[in-house]
Amino acid sequence: IEESGTSKGSFYHYFEGKDALLGSLAYMMDEKYEELEPTISEDADCYEVLLYLNRELLTMIEESINVELLTRLYSTQLTTHGERPLLDHGRTYYKLLKKIISRGREKKELRTDMSVSEMVRYYAMCERALLYEWCLRKGEYSLSEEAERKFPMMIGSLK
């Protein structure tokens, strides 16, 4: 509550508790994907689109989400018995990934021996790995630069 800069009354008016606030970060990430989706050409190489989405999302996270808040989001997701927004496949994040990966398979740009849902899960896992490591290291390096170097290797197996 103190970190949010609001009174207890205002905080609990908008959020049921700390978990709800932290969960809202996942939907902030969805807003970024909603902003990016119209910029993606139907003709674009789907692997390159996946790299683009990752680069843009992680740049936004690095520039606008406090690493301690992100760390709390991840720790809450590990211990909560309630909703887990990071795994909610109804989110824009998962829907857009599914759409891009499906198109990539149809165009033979991505492998076809894995299911779309398995590939989406793998992509999300790789992205979380980058974010989790950045949180573990308390943001001591540029997340976007690290992703630029490592993410192509991580998801290269989807081709």
Regions found by a protein language model. Name each.
Residues 24, 28, 38-64, 116-123:
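Hydrophobic alpha-helical connector segments
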